Amino acid sequence: MDSDSERASLESIKDNSECVHVSNEPNLTATCVDSSVGEEGVTDVNSSAAVSELVPPEQGEGALLNSVPEISERGIPVDVVSSVDGGGEENAAFNIQEIDSVGGDAAAVEEVPLKSSSVVGEGREEEAGASIVKEEDFVAEANLSGDRLEENKEVSMEEEPSSHELSVCEVNGVDSLNDEENREVGEQIVCGSMGGEEIESDLESKKEKVDVIEEETTAQAASLVNAIEIPDDKEVACVAGFTEISSQDKGLDESGNGFLDEEPVKELQIGEGAKDLTDGDAKEGVDVTEDEMDIQVLKKSKEEEKVDSTTELEIETMRLEVHDVATEMSDKTVISSAVVTQFTGETSNDKETVMDDVKEDVDKDSEAGKSLDIHVPEATEEVDTDVNYGVGIEKEGDGVGGAEEAGQTVDLEEIREENQELSKELAQVDETKISEMSEVTETMIKDEDQEKDDNMTDLAEDVENHRDSSVADIEEGREDHEDMGVTETQKETVLGKVDRTKIAEVSEETDTRIEDEDQEKDDEMTDVAEDVKTHGDSSVADIEEGRESQEEMTETQEDSVMADEEPEEVEEENKSAGGKRKRGRNTKTVKGTGKKKEEDVCFMCFDGGDLVLCDRRGCTKAYHPSCVDRDEAFFQTKGKWNCGWHLCSKCEKTATYLCYTCMFSLCKGCAKDAVFFCIRGNKGLCETCMETVKLIERKQQEKEPAQLDFNDKTSWEYLFKDYWIDLKTQLSLSPEELDQAKRPLKGHETNASKQGTASETDYVTDGGSDSDSSPKKRKTRSRSKSGSAEKILSSGDKNLSDETMEWASKELLDLVVHMRRGDRSFLPMLEVQTLLLAYIKRYNLRDPRRKSQVICDSRLQNLFGKSHVGHFEMLNLLDSHFLKKEQNQADDIQGDIVDTEEPNHVDVDENLDHPVKSGKDKKRKTRKKNVRKGRQSNLDDFAAVDMHNINLIYLRRSLVEDLLEDSTAFEEKVASAFVRLRISGNQKQDLYRLVQVVGTSKAPEPYKVGKKTTDYVLEILNLDKTEVISIDIISNQDFTEDECKRLKQSIKCGLINRLTVGDIQEKAIALQEVRVKNLLEAEILRFSHLRDRASDMGRRKEYPYLLKLSNSLTMLTLRECVEKLQLLKSPEERQRRLEEIPEIHADPKMDPDCESEDEDEKEEKEKEKQLRPRSSSFNRRGRDPISPRKGGFSSNESWTGTSNYSNTSANRELSRSYSGRGSTGRGDYLGSSDDKVSDSMWTSAREREVQPSLGSEKPRSVSIPETPARSSRAIAPPELSPRIASEISMAPPAVVSQPVPKSNDSEKIWHYKDPSGKVQGPFSMAQLRKWNNTGYFPAKLEIWKANESPLDSVLLTDALAGLFQKQTQAVDNSYMKAQVAAFSGQSSQSEPNLGFAARIAPTTIEIPRNSQDTWSQGGSLPSPTPNQITTPTAKRRNFESRWSPTKPSPQSANQSMNYSVAQSGQSQTSRIDIPVVVNSAGALQPQTYPIPTPDPINVSVNHSATLHSPTPAGGKQSWGSMQTDHGGSNTPSSQNNSTSYGTPSPSVLPSQSQPGFPPSDSWKVAVPSQPNAQAQAQWGMNMVNNNQNSAQPQAPANQNSSWGQGTVNPNMGWVGPAQTGVNVNWGGSSVPSTVQGITHSGWVAPVQGQTQAYPNPGWGPTGHPQSQSQSQVQAQAGTTGSGWMQPGQGIQSGNSNQNWGTQNQTAIPSGGSGGNQAGYWGNQQQSQNGDSGYGWNRQSGGQQNNFKGQRVCKFFRENGHCRKGASCNYLHN
């Protein structure tokens, strides 16, 4: 390209002199050179970095300058001579002096004339003029965009990653259209060659552009954030990073008239580099990068120096021209300076202002100087190195240039000399500036902010990375940035870094706090759960309060995190939270809203510092985190935090009374027993604070200066006094108010002056809320004290001062002796406290940082057990060291906790693991009084069977495992001890029994027991038999009181030998070692857990815990936990317990000859209950320890060891379903002492109840034998129903031959023999009944009177039923003389074992008793077709499914509820006429019919006794005795509301072979004579086949005979005649049907003959059709098939629920509807009728002659249910 074309090119762009066309080629680094110029270079004398670079402009490369100021060389003056190859267009040399901007000097440009030198390029010489540009020239042309800086930097690094030498285009990322054109031709054009005549116009245009740039800078910067191309010069300037470009370096064109605008671009590049300060990765390795780049540039400079030399003439010419240009540009300097001021906030000419600002910034960031201290010496070394490099470059510049070098040697040498001079000057200036800077920097190091260090580091990196500008540009750009941009850039960078640092710190703190708070919340919730379990007696309100507190804490924590996320707001609050009384650092309120006026001192130590506020609304209290055992991270997490001032210091409930000056607070309940003085409302002073305040008010410290010095500013007392004075001023409290302070709820004796002297009140009693006690954790030792106790203590202690008896603990006495020089006499509490404070002051034990804390020396550490103790805590802990005080307390709770000196608490420690007793232990009080230190003398007395005694010889599995370690003594130690064995069953709760170990044996193979392996097995006495069990199945838990009581009953019954005091004591001593070890470990574990939990939750030492100690929940503080732990771990305590001889409780009542007063009292009460007309005592809870709900023993299991607990719940349900009016609806066990069998009982209330229902006095009829209670959960016995209107009347006296001998139940005349063969007794019948009902006797237990021999014994079941003769002679003896309400289902309270037989009148015949147990001795009851059970209760269904279909044998207790005649062996041949006539209305008419007698062997009803049946008009006839509840209740005790049919025996039933019934006669119920008849009568009285005539062979001894041949379905009523040959049984007959018409109905055994499975067939009368038809028992129209079916008509269909007594004309709801499928027996009401199936007894509807007047229960009528259930005497329909 020739000169014309070049000129034309320059002319074309002179209008926009600032336009710079930059090539973006990666390898092009020259500034605006001709594309054809490739050999011309630049001579560069080193800048502040002492760098002299001569960049060879090889094919696209131009001058590349390296001017990298280090951190320490900010503003170092640099003289630079630059010879720029502009394609022959310009040569420039500059000598610029730069002043450090950090030092505050305004950058100044020193104009140095340079020699004009010619630049050789492509064979032609071109002269260029260099102009010296002022620092401010180009400031206004650029506005740095923060976003663009990062982008520019990234572009720079991309385009020149290896050498970090970037062209202008690469640095700025310019991609304009001109740049693209230049890139295509491979040239870089510098625009701006203008003629000399255009300079003025250009200057004017520059000024205008400066103004425009000022306005458009912001918009341009924003628009260029995301743009890669820079379309015009203004955008280039913005990208370059200069705040203003005030001058240009105009190079001369060929004619010398034009100037090339090159400098703005270069300055822009510098500005960009300087502004790019926010990049974090530019902060490291700055020094290394500079060194590497300097080396690279120096190498290039050496080569360029040889090729590119200029003549001195050219340089001289340029110097003159530059001088002129500089003069012309001076006006622009002013404008640029103004612009600079806009961006930097300082004028470039005001150095002092810059220095002040810098120092002020440095003051704000004191850490910045630290890094400067590091970088300054390094930068100084690098500057020196750069100078040396520059010198070396000049020396080594020869040899480069090839053929063109020869013509320029002279010029290069001159330039080298100048460069050397400049280098020397620069070095000198550098040294001077460095020394000055070092001094300034040393001052700044202490206070300078981190922002400046980061900004200067970024500046150095940017200059280092972007040194592709000319030396002149670098000099001017550096000056501009030092004055204009450095400070601002540093501020921005450092602020950014500080913000990031703060954000990181806040985030880290927040995360830590959130984690801590989450853990804290988890711990607290876990503690709440544990507390709820441990402290079972806590009220629901307490739990709710805890839950609410937790929610409040959560909300507070959330607010806290929100506050932390706004550090500026918190900072503002911190500024406003200060107060005049801060003594520590400025208070920083971590929490709080600032809406309330917070206190500025800690409420616990009264000192200032970093405090946290309580978040409770209206609470102004502040605390040190350490005072509440929290760290600041805890308060930075989510949730609210309420201080412990708002919780009662004793029970942790919401506090009502608050102390003004300490954390002590009380709820209303605790305030009754505590000393608190209310001053205003519910706020006042605790006892401790009141005494301290009184000392302050009365100035008693002047009288006793050694005690409390409230004027010592270093003491805690001074802080307390200061706080009190301020508080009193704020509240305007007067001395009169203090004197009139009242105790809450006790207006008397609250005046402080009435409390007596200071010695009368304990300084720390309740008020020990102290500095270290946390919110909820105050010591509560004083809870059992009163004011009078305090006075007694104070006065009493004075009297004891001369005694030798120790009045305090050893540790406290040591301190007192030390301070009083050997005097051990008694001191009151306050004097001891004063002595302690004097000791602390004498030895200066106050913590200098926290005056409320005391540093414990060895003496205090022994006293308090810790290295630091709070003031209040210390005073409070003294309370535990006063022994006298504890002994004077009424309720010695502390003695239970620390029992070092009191041996009477031994068993308390031993029983710590035992469950809390449900009732009061009367013997426990005497146990404390009668402390025995040696062996007891009453070793032969009978020992009490109570929790304490049995605990001494009770072995848990863990104890047995410990005993296995000594195999030699294992058997000896475990023998005679008790273990707890689980009893299998279907109960929801497992049942356990205490059994005695009688020996050990070896197992065939070893097995695992815990962590041990053994082959030992235990031989235990399980009731009446010995069993072998493995150790691993015994319980590892403590036994319960109920289990202990059951054990006591077993011992009383003789199953286990009675224990004596000597036996238990000997065994307890043998087990003492292992028990003490186990108990100590358990106690240590428990107390350790309490201590750790309290520590984890930050609770203080005075926080009270509830702990189970023996039979009570005891408050235990954390402090006491620690003390207890120390005590338990001490060898002395262990040895003391080992040597202690346990105390054994004696119980004279365990003597068989001693009658229990309690039992007598109960019997008397029970007798009274029997006389009550309601006869509902059976509904009351029994008093026996064995309740059906707790599970007991069936009579069978008590002696056989087999458990039938699966029947208990079912029986309980059955008892409710089947029990009559007198039976319990709660499932109470039979035969609590409420049950009496005496005839007088039966007649007393029962007969009176019956009489109103009887139309006339008629002889009573047959009764049914009652059954002894199968278990304690058996169905309640039937009693006479008040609705007995239709009850069978008595038989004529002529028939009754043998009355029942009366017996007094309370008379002790009965003996029995236990399984060991030992005769026990005498006992009363009431005792025997109770034990039998609780299941301790076998079914065949025989008893005899004291005046008789064992040969005359009778079965207990018979005796309980009233049959005291072993054999009866007649039917009259076999059955009751009076008819029983059994058929009506009335259960008698006095007769627990009555089955269907209700109560007998005194003139009735005897009830034969069967020695067998109840229906199900083995837990299986007879099942009447269990597959068809439709009972509404699942329990009953389940229970019925257990009935055994096994064949009953005469010898086997007749478990099917059949009357077993095999036992009697006697033939009763009397005749019983049952006057049961069913009229057309279904009413019974008293008539008499002969009953043929079958085989006498079967002892059935063979006698033709005539029994009149009183059937009052309107009374519904109900076959009550036929009731067999589906649940198989053993005492059906069903209470049919309608009249019973008496006790019909099967022989009464009309059979085909028995034509003797009149047409109108219905079923005559014959009563079999069965001396051994089972107590539980079954449906048809389980008679033998009495309906057999001579033509019908009789079934042999069929106990299961039933009502004729009626087809049987358990859900049926009386049904029509069964088909012949059908064994109509309940569940089938056990005897094959040998004769047609004979129904061998039985409860259990399967029927060999096919039983008709009619829908709900009941007892169908079988007999001749004509006799059956005569039975007018048709149910009413509308009650299809209900009641007695007409014989001969077959099974009546249509009613699937035949009921027992729908014989009335009144329709009966339950059986009346043909669609009744409910299967209720005996007119049981369906649920829709209001009766949810209380049993068969419920006759629905009908005109029943109730003695209550047939009234309907008003509760049942109004509410649909009656709470009395079956015991109610009114109708429930």
UniProtKB/Swiss-Prot annotation:
<dbReference type="Pfam" id="PF02201">
    <property type="entry name" value="SWIB"/>
</dbReference>
<feature type="compositionally biased region" description="Low complexity">
    <location>
        <begin position="1585"/>
        <end position="1602"/>
    </location>
</feature>
<dbReference type="InterPro" id="IPR003169">
    <property type="entry name" value="GYF"/>
</dbReference>
<feature type="compositionally biased region" description="Basic and acidic residues">
    <location>
        <begin position="444"/>
        <end position="455"/>
    </location>
</feature>
<comment type="subunit">
    <text>Interacts with unmethylated histone H3 and AGO2. The interaction with AGO2 in required to direct DNA methylation and silencing.</text>
</comment>
<feature type="compositionally biased region" description="Basic and acidic residues">
    <location>
        <begin position="1139"/>
        <end position="1152"/>
    </location>
</feature>
<feature type="domain" description="SWIB/MDM2">
    <location>
        <begin position="801"/>
        <end position="884"/>
    </location>
</feature>
<dbReference type="InterPro" id="IPR036128">
    <property type="entry name" value="Plus3-like_sf"/>
</dbReference>
<comment type="function">
    <text>Plays a central role in integrating RNA silencing and chromatin signals in 21 nt siRNA-dependent DNA methylation on cytosine pathway leading to transcriptional gene silencing of specific sequences. Involved in a chromatin-based RNA silencing pathway that encompasses both post-transcriptional gene silencing (PTGS) (e.g. RDR1, RDR6 and AGO2) and transcriptional gene silencing (TGS) (e.g. siRNA-dependent DNA methylation and histone H3) components. Mediates siRNA accumulation at specific chromatin loci.</text>
</comment>
<feature type="region of interest" description="Disordered">
    <location>
        <begin position="1485"/>
        <end position="1605"/>
    </location>
</feature>
<feature type="region of interest" description="Disordered">
    <location>
        <begin position="361"/>
        <end position="409"/>
    </location>
</feature>
<feature type="compositionally biased region" description="Basic residues">
    <location>
        <begin position="578"/>
        <end position="588"/>
    </location>
</feature>
<feature type="domain" description="Plus3">
    <location>
        <begin position="944"/>
        <end position="1076"/>
    </location>
</feature>
<dbReference type="InterPro" id="IPR011011">
    <property type="entry name" value="Znf_FYVE_PHD"/>
</dbReference>
<feature type="compositionally biased region" description="Polar residues">
    <location>
        <begin position="1193"/>
        <end position="1212"/>
    </location>
</feature>
<feature type="domain" description="GYF">
    <location>
        <begin position="1307"/>
        <end position="1361"/>
    </location>
</feature>
<feature type="compositionally biased region" description="Polar residues">
    <location>
        <begin position="1678"/>
        <end position="1708"/>
    </location>
</feature>
<feature type="compositionally biased region" description="Basic and acidic residues">
    <location>
        <begin position="497"/>
        <end position="513"/>
    </location>
</feature>
<feature type="compositionally biased region" description="Low complexity">
    <location>
        <begin position="1666"/>
        <end position="1677"/>
    </location>
</feature>
<dbReference type="GO" id="GO:1990269">
    <property type="term" value="F:RNA polymerase II C-terminal domain phosphoserine binding"/>
</dbReference>
<dbReference type="GO" id="GO:0016593">
    <property type="term" value="C:Cdc73/Paf1 complex"/>
</dbReference>
<feature type="compositionally biased region" description="Polar residues">
    <location>
        <begin position="1518"/>
        <end position="1528"/>
    </location>
</feature>
<feature type="compositionally biased region" description="Basic and acidic residues">
    <location>
        <begin position="147"/>
        <end position="156"/>
    </location>
</feature>
<feature type="compositionally biased region" description="Polar residues">
    <location>
        <begin position="752"/>
        <end position="762"/>
    </location>
</feature>
<feature type="compositionally biased region" description="Basic and acidic residues">
    <location>
        <begin position="273"/>
        <end position="286"/>
    </location>
</feature>
<keyword id="KW-0238">DNA-binding</keyword>
<dbReference type="GO" id="GO:0008270">
    <property type="term" value="F:zinc ion binding"/>
</dbReference>
<feature type="compositionally biased region" description="Low complexity">
    <location>
        <begin position="1722"/>
        <end position="1735"/>
    </location>
</feature>
<dbReference type="InterPro" id="IPR019835">
    <property type="entry name" value="SWIB_domain"/>
</dbReference>
<feature type="region of interest" description="Disordered">
    <location>
        <begin position="434"/>
        <end position="591"/>
    </location>
</feature>
<feature type="coiled-coil region">
    <location>
        <begin position="196"/>
        <end position="218"/>
    </location>
</feature>
<feature type="region of interest" description="Disordered">
    <location>
        <begin position="1649"/>
        <end position="1746"/>
    </location>
</feature>
<keyword id="KW-0677">Repeat</keyword>
<feature type="compositionally biased region" description="Basic and acidic residues">
    <location>
        <begin position="361"/>
        <end position="378"/>
    </location>
</feature>
<feature type="coiled-coil region">
    <location>
        <begin position="403"/>
        <end position="437"/>
    </location>
</feature>
<dbReference type="InterPro" id="IPR001965">
    <property type="entry name" value="Znf_PHD"/>
</dbReference>
<feature type="compositionally biased region" description="Polar residues">
    <location>
        <begin position="1409"/>
        <end position="1433"/>
    </location>
</feature>
<dbReference type="Pfam" id="PF00642">
    <property type="entry name" value="zf-CCCH"/>
</dbReference>
<keyword id="KW-0175">Coiled coil</keyword>
<dbReference type="GO" id="GO:0042393">
    <property type="term" value="F:histone binding"/>
</dbReference>
<feature type="zinc finger region" description="PHD-type">
    <location>
        <begin position="599"/>
        <end position="665"/>
    </location>
</feature>
<feature type="compositionally biased region" description="Polar residues">
    <location>
        <begin position="1737"/>
        <end position="1746"/>
    </location>
</feature>
